[in-house]
Amino acid sequence: SSDLNFDHAELSIQNITELVIALNAKTRSSGLPLGGSEGDYSVNQTSTWTSGYPVRSRFARKHPEYDPHHFSAEQLLKNGEADALLWVSEFNPDKTPPNMNIPKIVIGHTNMHANDTDVFIPVSTAGIDHTGTMFRIDSSVSLPLGTLRESSLPSLVEVMTAIEAAL
């Protein structure tokens, strides 16, 4: 996980594992990953639920085609096969699109500073500015998200619905 990108991260995992083992000597205990996925698991689950296939699928032939290598965003961009880039990141303002010489549409966190963007649409954040649903990191449970504050920004769902209606 990218959350464990630091020196000796494996020692932290080993310590947690040893703690769970020690606790299990007298009681019951388990360790669950809680690292943030920034919605990756939810997107993958939604794609699988709606199309029968996870992300890295294409729909150019009116039916889903799944190929995790050829249809990865990195591969398509690297090979110059993308006409434009739609970048969506409502949770992390530091997750910005790669610097590519193609048109970029960014739908993102209001504090995102995406350089060289053709279109930027700020959105509110699920679980903070509006309700929503996300999948837990183990992809087995969907969790309802509440609202902590009011926002004048549209939600990602509202923006995507408006784009779809305009097409």
PLM regions and their residue ranges:
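Short connector loops at secondary-structure junctions
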Residues: 29-56
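Non-catalytic alpha/beta scaffold blocks inside enzyme catalytic domains
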Residues: 2-28, 51-167
